[in-house]
Amino acid sequence: MGDPTNNNDSETKPNPATYWKSRFPVARIKKIMQADQDVGKVAQVTPVIMSKALELFMQSIIQESCKQTRLHQAKRVTVSHLKHAVQSVEQFDFLQDIVEKVPDAPPIKAERKTKRPRARRAANEGEHNESVPAKKVKKNTVKEEEIEKDDESATTETPVKEEPTGEETEADHEEKASVDHGNFSDKTTSEASSASGDE
């Protein structure tokens, strides 16, 4: 009886990730059914069955609407996607009159354009917009991305030269000049000479 190795409880319970309990309000369904004068008494189980049928119907029409949304490469399910779902599935023919008034969805989009990376876009904007002052940046290398996949197979590195901004000191000019001419002298000697000149 109390055998811990034989646990059937895990086999009978459904996985919570795949099972959810969603029921439409049975009392409200019963009121709607009784509002019709042709309907007499309603058995107690009838609204429960109608609730389950409504749930299955909603699940079916929403799944088909999601398929239409994916076909149109949209991010949101809209009324026009619901209209296309009703028109494409024979089971939903009874809804044709209702969805006729809904405007059609835009035509299916072609492949979306690939976006340029932000870093490259910002670099290109900086080259074309000279009214914005450039930031003080030391000499760096930037990897250029492939413009077209077929043109180049590898990336190249190119040095980026910054224009002087007027905020630079004489030491910065000397350092840049020594780097540009291939003269890699000690930083300490250039700093020492500029420090002794400042005092």
Swiss-Prot record:
GO terms for cellular component: chromatin; cytosol; epsilon DNA polymerase complex; negative cofactor 2 complex; nuclear replication fork; nucleus. GO terms for molecular function: core promoter sequence-specific DNA binding; protein heterodimerization activity; RNA polymerase II general transcription initiation factor activity. Keywords: Nucleus, Transcription, Transcription regulation. Residues 106-199 are annotated as: Disordered. Disruption phenotype: Leads to only a few rounds of cell division before arresting with an elongated cell (cdc) phenotype. Transcription regulator complex subunit that is essential for cell cycle progression. Belongs to the NC2 alpha/DRAP1 family. This is Transcription regulator complex subunit bur6. The lineage of its organism: Eukaryota, Fungi, Dikarya, Ascomycota, Taphrinomycotina. The gene is bur6.
